[in-house]
Amino acid sequence: MATNTVNGVLVCSDGTNIPLKEELAEGTESDLKTDTVYTVSAMNVGDYAPGKTVVSALVSCDNGVGFCYILSQGLVAAIIPWSVKGAVSDGTPALCQPYTLKAGDIVRCMNNTAADREAAIACYTASGVSRIFKVTPTGGATNELVDLQTGNSIGDTLQGQRITKWFGTSVDGSKIETQGFYVVDALGNVVGSCSATNPIVQQPLFSFAATNIALNYKAQFLTNS
């Protein structure tokens, strides 16, 4: 696969900006390290600025983007807002809550082609948990988004928690036959909905939610092709 230049910045509470830049392969989740033009050597963010508290951030890819987050001790520690270059309307958005970097923390990014249909929901709960759910549709179907780390459903992953902020991304546009992404209960009733933004056209932004999650709940959307 081709590689593209992915850029980003993490803005810290003390005014420090951490510039990010890396040539990342399309279709492969990869580490996004610091920009050597400004930081001398390419480093993971936790090793470059341990103890700094990130309050806002943005990562931009050339053609398409699946998701981006800070990985800490094997878990999604913070969701980093993502976009395609030029499709930015809200500058560097605030994180759902400030996050203090630890040694070993890594920024992970999925750099995609423009044609890649990977869809994602970024969720933040009332208890401070951040998770990302994803799926790549291949035709007309009901597509379930599953946890990017475990492959589990939203019900298995966030059972007993309440989603308070989320956003969704998909390039499918008119192929989508639901109002964005739905969360359905065990009986198939819609209990939550999250709009789907095309990150090639518009920067996705978090919206407020109040969606309680229980066992056997699913996140899904319908496509016609």
Regions found by a protein language model. Name each.
Residues M1-S225:
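Beta-strand-centric surfaces of beta-sandwich/beta-rich domains
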